[in-house]
Amino acid sequence: ADTVSGAALFKANCAQCHVGGGNLVNRAKTLKKEALEKYNMYSAKAIIAQVTHGKGAMPAFGIRLKAEQIENVAAYVLEQADNGWKK
């Protein structure tokens, strides 16, 4: 997966609600490693499924983004979670 492409896609599609790995809609369910682990989302497979199909307040992006793009976003999210969202 291409995390550089994932970063650009994240900025364009996800950062409105998830800036800096946070969550402006549900503050408990951030993209930080601890929250991803707590909610069983700390895997590319889980992130890809949620981004593709949406859940709750989060819209589905499977219509707007190609599978490869969603994989790149998931790789970027996991990379950032591992690095504490410092970049």
UniProtKB/Swiss-Prot annotation:
**What InterPro entries does the entry give?**
Cyt_c-like_dom (IPR009056), Cyt_c-like_dom_sf (IPR036909), Cyt_C6 (IPR023655), Cyt_C_IC (IPR008168)
Going by the UniProt record, its keywords in alphabetical order are: Electron transport, Heme, Iron, Metal-binding, Photosynthesis, Thylakoid, Transport
Q: Name one Pfam family in it.
A: Cytochrome_CBB3
The answer to whether UniProt assigns keyword Protease to this entry is no
Q: Record's Gene Ontology CC terms?
A: plasma membrane-derived thylakoid lumen
Q: What family does the Swiss-Prot or TrEMBL record give for this protein?
A: Belongs to the cytochrome c family. PetJ subfamily.
Q: What is this protein called?
A: Cytochrome c6
